[in-house]
Amino acid sequence: MTLGQFGGLFCIYLIAVIFILTLTYQEFRRVKFNFNVLFSMLYLLTFYFGFPLTCMLVFQFGVAVVPVEYLLYAMLSATAFYGIYYVTYKTRLRQPRSQPRTPIFTMNRVETNLTWVLLALVAVGTVGIFFMQNGFLLFKLDSYSKIFSSDVSGVALKRFFYFFIPAMLVVYFLKQDRRAWFFFLASTVAFGILTYVIVGGTRANIIIAFSLFLFIGIVRGWITLWMLAAAGVFGIVGMFWLALKRYGLDVNGAEAFYTFLYLTRDTFSPWENLGLLLQNYDKIDFQGLAPIVRDFYVFIPSALWPERPDLVLNTANYFTWDVLDNHSGLAISPTLIGSLVVMGGVLFIPLGAIVVGLIIKWFDWLYEQGKAESNRYKAAILQSFCFGAVFNIIVLAREGLDSFVSRVVFFCVIFGACLVLAKLLYWLFDTAGLIKRQGIKSNRLSTPNAGNQL
């Protein structure tokens, strides 16, 4: 990359960042937090945060990067995608209802407490089973990629660990004070550190717990933008330190700065992967919607499907194995736009932007229903579900649409199963005479707002 090429890229970069930041800041001033603001921040992080890091790697350390024209295509496609997404998100599809909706379900105190207990048991129970099978992998494995090898059993259990976070979200939303806020941070980060040590370097639970703590603080007005920026810097440094421990790296001086740049870029902003994918566009055999279906394979037990493929060919694995011919053991993220390109080429980019706009619009509708709900137990469940889905939104921006669909369906199934089981247990306890009727009557006095019922 020459200085002239850098100047041209920087102009496009500046226009794109100002465009997205302006729209995001206007939305932030209007509502403080919603899923459009969240997705926009994640989108900026994924596709634009890495550009300065890439430039420092190129000019400070002489690192070879994707040809500039493909980086330009990546930046332009990301900007066009966001424009189409934003128009879709802001388009009103129907007029507001004048008639009240019939509520799909209601909640009381016992059912709500049973729900978060069941969610926590799912997480703690699967962590315990994984630990009994593998021990502390952080101290046993000499390479992070071996987490996905046949030496590690029960890998599918890792998907259940995350449900500790929505469990603690229910606890927070029942109280919604500073004490509950800090309890959420302490409990979820402690659980995240435990899973980091047991699994051998998976940082997702720690990142999500800290991010949700900040988002809640923004919503409640307990955190300012300056505090958020400082927390972001702390989070980046913390994730870098955890990455060093995960990969067993011992660096200092210029090497430490170089390692910080490329690990931070790869962790938070794999935007160069999109340029790399576009560079190899002629090698892609468009997969259609098959990667979405294939990503569900991991949820099917081998006992039910003995011929189930051990390796799932989703868009990330297709990009890594078939396009790049990379078989190092770790999948290279194609990003949201890259996953659309793998599925249907550049024509899928505007279609994907429309789909994503509708997805974020639905999450915001559900979140608003939760905030407006007068039954505080039902409100806690709805808001916990929405905030608990933040991890899926991160997966959407960073990993792709296929990974998002499988994970959000899995999240809905497990969350819904715990909710239904909680109601069933409540019915059994009530039938057995274990429920105090006075408490039930007082809870039923809190009826949902007729204009905001689900």
From Swiss-Prot:
Biological processes annotated in GO: enterobacterial common antigen biosynthetic process
InterPro entries: WzyE (IPR010691)
Keywords, alphabetical: Cell inner membrane, Cell membrane, Membrane, Transmembrane, Transmembrane helix
Keyword Membrane appears in the UniProt entry: yes
Subcellular location: Cell inner membrane
NCBIfam families, per database record: PRK02975.1
Name under which the protein is recorded: Probable ECA polymerase
Naturally occurring in which organism (per UniProt): Yersinia pestis
